[in-house]
């Protein structure tokens, strides 16, 4: 079993670029089309580690889906981000949905 560092609904930062994101899904290993030779995913060690579907915001505040290796992410210690409140809301909404009981009728 592969353990992941980050969880769904958790806020993270890109370790190189510093942008804030929210984890929306996790793959136990790289699962997209075979990478090009110049892509980060071409590294076999990175491909066999967890990969994360992360929502970030572009310069216009629009959501952008990214796919990042665990090695590219760091923990985010701050809970509130006044400059990007929609990412705070997304993270809170996902965490709430994961904690809410599922009702079956």
From Swiss-Prot:
It is found in: Cytoplasm. SMART domains: YccV-like (SM00992). GO terms for biological process: response to heat. Residues 80-105 are annotated as: Disordered. Pfam families: YccV-like. Keywords: Cytoplasm, Stress response. GO terms for molecular function: DNA binding. It comes from the Bacteria. One of its GO terms (cellular component) is cytoplasm. Involved in the degradation of certain denaturated proteins, including DnaA, during heat shock stress. NCBIfam families: PRK14129.1, yccV. HAMAP family: HspQ (MF_01194). Belongs to the HspQ family. This is Heat shock protein HspQ. It comes from Yersinia pestis.
């Amino acid at each position: 079993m592969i353990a992941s560092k980050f969880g769904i609904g958790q806020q993270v930062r890109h370790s190189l670029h510093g942008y804030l994101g929210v984890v929306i899904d996790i793959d136990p290993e790289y699962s997209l089309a075979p990478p090009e030779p110049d892509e980060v995913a071409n590294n076999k060690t990175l491909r066999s580690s967890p990969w994360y579907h992360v929502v970030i915001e572009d310069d216009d505040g629009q959501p952008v889906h990214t796919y990042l290796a665990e090695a590219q992410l760091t923990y985010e210690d701050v809970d509130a981000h006044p400059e990007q409140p929609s990412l705070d809301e997304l993270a809170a909404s996902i965490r709430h949905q994961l904690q809410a009981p599922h009702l079956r009728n």
